[in-house]
UniProtKB/Swiss-Prot annotation:
Gene Ontology biological process terms in this record: fatty acid biosynthetic process
Protein name: Holo-[acyl-carrier-protein] synthase
Cofactor(s) for this UniProt protein: Mg(2+)
UniProt keyword Repeat, yes or no: no
Family: Belongs to the P-Pant transferase superfamily. AcpS family.
Reaction equations catalysed: apo-[ACP] + CoA = holo-[ACP] + adenosine 3',5'-bisphosphate + H(+)
An MF annotation (GO) of this entry: magnesium ion binding
Main location: cytoplasm
Residues at which Mg(2+) binds: 9, 58
Amino acid sequence: MAILGLGTDIVEISRIQAVVERTGERLARRILSPSEWQHYQQHQQPVRFLAKRFAVKEAAAKAFGTGIRNGLAFNQFEVVNDALGKPTLRLHSRAAELAVELGVKSLHVTLADERRYACATVIIES
């Protein structure tokens, strides 16, 4: 296997909080998949949840080398967890097509958050 891409992102949680206070659900609706939206609505710390998802999706777009454009959207990158809680990505629509085009075989995700920040790294392998 070879590394095809690496992306990382850090988000100031208070910035996400300010957007949520100003625009309500708009940001969450724009970036979350339907399943993530359900988790967001029930989460004890929804802004922290949203900040972590935003960081992963930004990191994924960087790892793919595309950013969010040319048919890609944040909600096409869905963060899912295995039975032990390990995060990974489920790709939808154009993101899934791009993964096939690039020959992606594995996706690796790591998340971290502290009081003020959330960060994520995504590695894609062939």
